[in-house]
Regions:
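Structural signal for well-ordered, non-membrane alpha-helices
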Residues: 83-86, 112-116, 396, 403, ...
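Long, amphipathic alpha-helical stalk/connector segments used for oligomerization, subunit docking
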Residues: 378-382, 387, 405, 409-416, ...
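Non-catalytic interaction-recognition regions
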Residues: 182, 421-425
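Aromatic-residue-lined binding/catalytic grooves and analogous aromatic/hydrophobic interfacial grooves
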Residues: 447
């Protein structure tokens, strides 16, 4: 570990606030990010952990229609739900904000203008999916059709199965997932980000990341091998950040373009807020412009290209901002063998869980089954086993025995260390080595291995304390 404190930026995926959080949201990116941030604070690094609610985009407007209210009211309602949930789980955000702030709007528009001034934006007319039944243009996630490159049924402009990009118009047998109607296409103008301009630089940069998880690196290089295409960064919607271009008053900036800029806007907001105890308003630059700083982005696997392709292109094209040091993308947490689904109501909602069980038990269990390299499964049986056989039987009993020894032999006062024999010294050395090993696992973002190392250490030292209690 370094002796000089490092500037560590911990960026946590911004959730759509169109519903309540379930356990899959927590295990996928929020919990590992919090563990990582706490670890780096403990070893003396300067940590800034930021995230916020993604209040824009079609999911929020659809939920507003379902509840017969406005997108703003939905966005604020569920922002509070998510924010309160994170507090209940004791997540240590330096700032959890939202995309509906003036600061975020200004930051997004500033980067948009920088990209435009640097020649990386272009206006084009294109045919975009449209629902005659709902009288609205459809975002990528609300169209479904047959992939033009493989037999899969897919959504949007990218196939999760074959990994290839395409235009929505290339999909066959298209339907709107909002109203199940046939999709038509209408000509409309949009502003595009010239991603091919960044192809060579991104390829070189990603290949240099020898420590990235293989799934992250391989998926990113797969996108590049298919050849990057220009991506529209505006949409025909009326909810979101306004486009700072004449003639685009009835359009908004594409939610995924502006959402990934949220990490920067949140850092700036924190820098100017009372939460910044240093009270240096431009201190955000210590994380974003200092090349020695390290950025860690905690995501689900479905968000990989947005943080290894889209965000780096934006940062390169708009200024001298630091690029991600690592994109820590987890697989999915399933529930009893099936993927969590809000629409199918197949989930364990965090609010329901916390009504019955302690948040620390949840944090421990999710850490032990964290889906780092493959999908993992939440079951109630394994949660109870984890709580009873590990937290209570191993950790809890060890703490109880040590407290009893101190109470019965030293009048509840922790004694000075003296008269250590070889067995004592070996146990202390084993504990030291075990926790150093656990720290190494955390440095490498291997959270399950870290927890296993700690629990093995506790099991190892439990026997001597048990014998001491007996004697």
């Amino acid at each position: 570990m370094n002796n000089k404190p490092e500037n560590i930026l911990v960026c946590v995926a911004w959730p759509y606030v169109n519903g309540e959080p379930h356990l899959g949201h927590i295990a996928g990116n929020n919990l590992p990010a919090d563990i990582f941030a706490r670890f780096h604070r403990m070893i003396g690094n300067n940590v800034l952990m930021v995230s916020g609610s993604d209040q824009h985009g079609t999911p929020v407007t659809i939920r507003a229609k379902e509840e017969n209210t406005t997108p703003k009211k939905i966005a604020e309602k569920y922002h509070k739900v998510w924010s309160d949930t994170f507090k209940e789980l004791d997540f240590s955000f330096d700032l959890y904000t939202k995309t509906g702030t003036d600061n975020h709007k200004e930051t997004v528009q500033n980067l948009f203008n920088s990209l435009n001034e640097n020649g990386f934006l272009e206006e084009k007319y294109s045919e975009q999916p449209y629902s005659e039944k709902s009288e609205m243009f459809l975002s990528d996630r609300y169209i479904e059709g047959d992939c033009p490159h493989c037999p899969s049924r897919t959504k949007g402009d990218q196939c999760d199965d074959c990994g290839k990009d395409f235009e929505p118009i290339d999909l066959k047998n298209l339907i709107s997932t909002i109203d199940n109607s046939e999709v038509t296409f209408k000509s409309t103008k949009h502003i595009y980000l010239k991603l091919p301009e960044f192809q060579e630089k991104l390829d070189e940069w990603i290949k240099s990341k020898t420590y990235w998880r293989s799934a992250v690196k391989n998926q990113s290089l797969g996108f590049l091998s298919n050849g990057l295409i220009d991506r529209a960064i505006t949409r025909d919607i009326d909810w979101g950040v306004e486009v700072p271009v004449n003639g685009y008053e009835n359009k908004r900036i594409y939610v995924w373009f502006e959402a990934v800029i949220g990490y920067l806007s949140a850092s700036i907001e924190w820098s100017e807020s009372k939460n910044n105890k240093i009270q240096k308003k431009d201190i955000w630059k210590d994380w974003w412009l200092n090349p020695d700083s390290k950025h860690f982005y905690f995501q689900g696997k479905d968000n990989i290209p947005f943080h290894t392709i889209i965000l780096p292109a934006i940062l390169i094209g708009s200024g001298n901002y630091n690029l991600p040091y690592d994109v820590v993308a987890n697989e999915y947490l399933n529930f009893s063998g099936r993927q969590f689904s809000k629409s199918k109501n197949w989930a364990v909602w965090v609010s329901d869980f916390l009504k019955e069980y302690d948040s620390e038990a949840l944090r421990y269990y999710l850490s032990s089954i964290m889906p780092e390299s493959s999908d993992s499964d939440f079951t109630w049986e394994s949660f109870f086993d984890s709580n009873n056989n590990e937290l209570v039987a191993t950790f809890g009993n060890l703490v109880n025995r040590i407290q009893s020894l101190i109470k019965n032999n030293f009048d509840n006062i922790v004694p000075e260390t003296e008269n250590l024999d070889d067995v004592d010294n070996k146990m202390l050395l084993d504990i030291k080595n075990s926790f150093e090993s656990a720290g190494d696992f955390l440095e490498k973002r291997q959270f399950r291995n870290r927890l296993k190392e700690i629990m093995l250490s506790l099991i190892h030292i439990s026997e001597p304390t048990r014998q001491a209690e007996i004697s």
